[in-house]
Amino acid sequence: TEVSGMADEKHESKRSCHSRQKWFSVAAILLLIVLAAGLSVRYISFVSQTIYQESTTHLEEVLHKSNNMLKEMVRKNVTYLHLYNGFLENTPDEDEIQAYIEEAQQNTGFVDFYFLTYDGNYMTVTGETGYLGLQANLDEKLAHGEDIVMNTALPGKAQMLVFVCPKNHGSYRGFAYDAIAISYYNDAVLTLLDNSAFQGNASNYVIYPDGRVVIDNSVNRKETVYNFIAMLRSYSDLSEEQITELSNAFAQGSSGNLRVKLGDTSYYLVYEGTAVQSWTMLGLVSTKIVNASLDELWF
């Protein structure tokens, strides 16, 4: 009986030891699962952040390049206007003025040259008259002697970018003017904006601080965007507070990036102040396109 009791105790001890080993094994497996899940979450978060950083960095580089090209175009054309202004001040002969401007047009490629009044009326060198519906208070800016760049659309013509240089009054063919200006179709300006990012699937915009669009170089959009901030208010997932912060960043000429959802599509948005007329340049690309592009690079 004593031997039997000892055997039972030994058997019970083995069962207890086996149970503990089984419990430790289960605990170890559960711990490994928890660790693996934690690592997976951290890895997914790391990959997501890496994709975000790489994509926004690429967009920022392309945007910065376009920004520099736009600033150079503005600088160059404002310089041309000052040269033309100097010529006009020293040349009273109107036939000579017309020949000079027409030659300059052939050399530089602008659409037209305008003798411009403070309220937007104009005369060309050929004597054609009309009205430039400009997007700003021309009178106020000319009064401050500012060089101006803004967009306009004449009846029956495509959108144009207009460069304006103030002048201390002048007269051409009896038309009294307060400034001279040259224009380019937006298509000519768009060639300066590098849209090579992500196989040409990134949209570019140039906007005023209040969101009005100066240049729209969007892709895969059916509707024209007239005001970028208004578009965000209507279609994005951004709160009013976030939109206000973004508007302030545009007004201050700041640079930055963020994720934004428009309708059912998520995008990366990057922006950079241009130092031209308080404009901001924007780049916008779908996250799906970014992820697909990076998958091709990684795999």
Listing of model-derived features with the role each one plays in the protein:
Residues 2-18:
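N-terminal sensory and localization modules of signal-transduction and trafficking proteins
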Residues 16-93:
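Juxtamembrane extracytoplasmic/periplasmic/luminal helical "stalk" adjacent to the first N-terminal
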Residues 81, 111-116, 202-205:
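Short, hydrophobic-rich beta-strand element in sensory/regulatory alpha-beta domains
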Residues 94-108, 179-230:
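Solvent-exposed, extracytoplasmic
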Residues 100, 125-155, 221-259:
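Extracytoplasmic/periplasmic sensor domains and loops in membrane signaling proteins
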Residues 117-122, 208-212:
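Short acidic/glycine-rich beta-turn/loop cap or linker motifs at sensory/regulatory domain boundaries
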Residues 118, 122-196:
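Extracytoplasmic/periplasmic ligand-binding sensor regions of membrane-associated signaling proteins
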Residues 232-298:
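Extracellular/periplasmic juxtamembrane segments that couple receptor/chemosensory ectodomains to their
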